[in-house]
From Swiss-Prot:
CDD domains from the UniProt entry: Kunitz_textilinin-like (cd22594)
Family indicated by similarity: Belongs to the venom Kunitz-type family.
Protein name: Kunitz-type serine protease inhibitor nigrescinin-5
Source species of the chain: Cryptophis nigrescens (Eastern small-eyed snake)
PANTHER family reported in the protein's UniProt record: BPTI_KUNITZ INHIBITOR DOMAIN-CONTAINING PROTEIN, KUNITZ-TYPE PROTEASE INHIBITOR-RELATED
Protein's job: Serine protease inhibitor.
Record's signal peptide: 1-24
Species classification: Eukaryota, Metazoa, Chordata, Craniata, Vertebrata
Disulfide bonding pattern of the chain: C31-C81, C40-C64, C56-C77
Length: 83
Protein backbone atom coordinates (compact mmCIF):
# COMPACT_ATOMS: atom_id res chain seq x y z
CA UNK A 1 0.00 0.00 0.00
CA UNK A 2 1.33 3.43 -0.89
CA UNK A 3 2.00 5.98 1.83
CA UNK A 4 -0.85 8.14 0.46
CA UNK A 5 -3.27 5.23 0.74
CA UNK A 6 -2.09 4.52 4.25
CA UNK A 7 -2.71 8.14 5.24
CA UNK A 8 -6.22 7.97 3.79
CA UNK A 9 -6.88 4.93 5.97
CA UNK A 10 -5.26 6.25 9.15
CA UNK A 11 -6.95 9.68 9.04
CA UNK A 12 -10.54 8.43 9.53
CA UNK A 13 -9.43 5.81 12.08
CA UNK A 14 -7.67 8.45 14.16
CA UNK A 15 -10.69 10.75 13.97
CA UNK A 16 -13.00 7.89 15.00
CA UNK A 17 -10.81 7.13 18.03
CA UNK A 18 -10.82 10.76 19.17
CA UNK A 19 -14.58 11.21 18.74
CA UNK A 20 -15.71 7.88 20.21
CA UNK A 21 -16.71 8.37 23.87
CA UNK A 22 -15.35 6.12 26.60
CA UNK A 23 -17.95 3.72 27.98
CA UNK A 24 -18.18 3.26 31.73
CA UNK A 25 -16.91 -0.32 31.36
CA UNK A 26 -13.81 0.93 29.48
CA UNK A 27 -13.16 3.81 31.87
CA UNK A 28 -9.91 3.42 33.86
CA UNK A 29 -10.42 2.91 37.60
CA UNK A 30 -8.41 6.04 38.44
CA UNK A 31 -11.20 8.12 36.86
CA UNK A 32 -13.25 7.30 39.99
CA UNK A 33 -10.64 8.87 42.31
CA UNK A 34 -11.48 12.24 43.89
CA UNK A 35 -9.62 15.40 42.97
CA UNK A 36 -6.35 15.59 44.90
CA UNK A 37 -4.36 18.82 44.99
CA UNK A 38 -1.42 17.17 46.76
CA UNK A 39 0.67 18.77 49.53
CA UNK A 40 2.79 21.13 47.41
CA UNK A 41 2.01 24.81 46.98
CA UNK A 42 2.01 25.23 43.20
CA UNK A 43 -0.96 26.76 41.38
CA UNK A 44 -1.49 24.58 38.31
CA UNK A 45 -4.91 24.73 36.65
CA UNK A 46 -5.67 21.13 35.67
CA UNK A 47 -8.73 18.91 35.21
CA UNK A 48 -10.13 15.81 36.88
CA UNK A 49 -13.07 13.57 36.09
CA UNK A 50 -15.94 13.93 38.57
CA UNK A 51 -17.76 10.58 38.42
CA UNK A 52 -20.78 11.91 40.36
CA UNK A 53 -21.37 14.66 37.78
CA UNK A 54 -20.07 12.59 34.84
CA UNK A 55 -17.92 15.47 33.60
CA UNK A 56 -14.41 16.88 33.69
CA UNK A 57 -13.92 19.80 36.05
CA UNK A 58 -11.06 22.19 36.70
CA UNK A 59 -9.13 22.28 39.98
CA UNK A 60 -5.87 23.68 41.34
CA UNK A 61 -3.04 21.13 41.56
CA UNK A 62 -0.12 21.86 43.88
CA UNK A 63 2.43 20.17 41.62
CA UNK A 64 3.35 17.00 43.51
CA UNK A 65 1.82 13.70 44.59
CA UNK A 66 -1.97 13.78 44.12
CA UNK A 67 -3.36 10.90 42.05
CA UNK A 68 -3.78 9.77 38.44
CA UNK A 69 -7.13 11.57 38.00
CA UNK A 70 -5.27 14.71 36.92
CA UNK A 71 -5.12 15.99 33.33
CA UNK A 72 -3.38 19.00 31.75
CA UNK A 73 -6.27 19.63 29.35
CA UNK A 74 -10.02 19.10 29.45
CA UNK A 75 -9.73 17.28 26.12
CA UNK A 76 -7.34 14.73 27.64
CA UNK A 77 -9.71 14.26 30.60
CA UNK A 78 -12.72 13.74 28.34
CA UNK A 79 -10.85 11.39 26.03
CA UNK A 80 -9.70 9.26 28.98
CA UNK A 81 -12.67 9.28 31.36
CA UNK A 82 -15.86 10.91 30.06
CA UNK A 83 -18.63 8.67 28.77
Amino acid sequence: MSSGGLLLLLGPLTLWEVLTPVSSTDRPEFCELPEDSGPCKGLFHVFYYNSDQNQCLEFIYGGCYGNANNFKTIEECKRTCAA
